[in-house]
From Swiss-Prot:
Protein name: Putative ion-transport protein YfeO
Organism encoding this protein: Escherichia coli O127:H6 (strain E2348/69 / EPEC)
Domain of life: Bacteria
Lineage of the organism: Bacteria, Pseudomonadati, Pseudomonadota, Gammaproteobacteria, Enterobacterales
Keywords: Cell membrane, Ion channel, Ion transport, Membrane, Transmembrane, Transmembrane helix, Transport
Gene3D superfamilies: Clc chloride channel
Amino acid sequence: MLHPRARTMLLLSLPAVAIGITSSLILIMVMKIASVLQNLLWQRLPGTLGIAQDSPLWIIGVLTLTGIAVGLVIRFSQGHAGPDPACEPLIGAPIPPSALPGLIVALILGLAGGVSLGPEHPIITVNIALAVAIGARLLPRVNRMEWTILASAGTIGALFGTTVAAALIFSQTLNGSNEVPLWDRLFAPLMAAAAGALTTGLFFHPHFSLPIAHYGQMEMTDILSGAIVAAIAIAAGMVAVWCLPRLHAMMHQMKNPVFVLGIGGFILGILGVIGGPVSLFKGLDEMQQMVANQAFSTSDYFLLAVIKLAALVVAAASGFRGGRIFPAVFVGVALGLMLHEHVPAVPAAITVSCAILGIVLVVTRDGWLSLFMAAVVVPNTTLLPLLCIVMLPAWLLLAGKPMMMVNRPKQQPPHDNV
């Protein structure tokens, strides 16, 4: 016979697996549709019209029209495509299901149109809303927070293709007690994350790791170098933190989201022309291209880091529906490669991983997620002790500093962005 603790853990196992699978399928569906639309906008259509896909007019035109299209969705869809991600944490309160169609359409348009945001925030929002709405009907005795955690864990597992990220993130959220051990509380979320990761793996494998030279034995000077790199990345990120609420307030003085997002798309187009096609989109495929291109110089990497960080701020301030983690990782990779080119004595594995750690820490203020992203992009077990040590001064630097979020105006309804 099972112990009562085991029966309690098994109670949510089936719902957790179902939520994990569903979370992954929703992510896959959105990414597939966005990929088809992206291919149409950036490959087939310019080819049919005889226009180069990296033509300045095409880049500016597509991003401007993308902004207008997203603005129309936000303006006229029921629920106004959910909350403004610039004002929300990664894992927030559930939104009304009526806002989900508009949110999904706005996300797909942004991903396909080249906006410098990832899918993580809207996908988590969609899955939380569905899990809470359906779960409350099927199992009303389970509280909303449990459904929120399961949906978040399932989505994180699906996004990163592993349960490790969910385990790290929720280990600090689900604080155990003497009565309920931590791993008892982690059981159902990890089931959801595992189901999400395995389902994603059936269709595609998220490819985060970069072909960077292997790092051998750790030396004391490497710790100092890594801490300096992380501090530089944090400084760059804090510039974005300072700019975001000010640009957001300035742009949203115009009350019509069609105008706001149209102007935001136009600015993103100009940034895309300066940075080139590699500076567009969410950044994961593009950072692979950036590493593979041996022709980039120190100034090229610096330009890409600045352009991508500016595009991230503009996209978030404009109200595009998307997350900030994936483009932040791109910025970290560009900064790391730039610093390695500038000081070749410091291994690229250190500069890239520590830059990712610093910039993701600024964006998420989550130490575990920052460590995970740094370790998964530069997969090298020798780096793990160094990253854990570098995290300490990085965390001290950010203690008490403002987060990369905008304080929502009190007069603005929580899910109304008109």
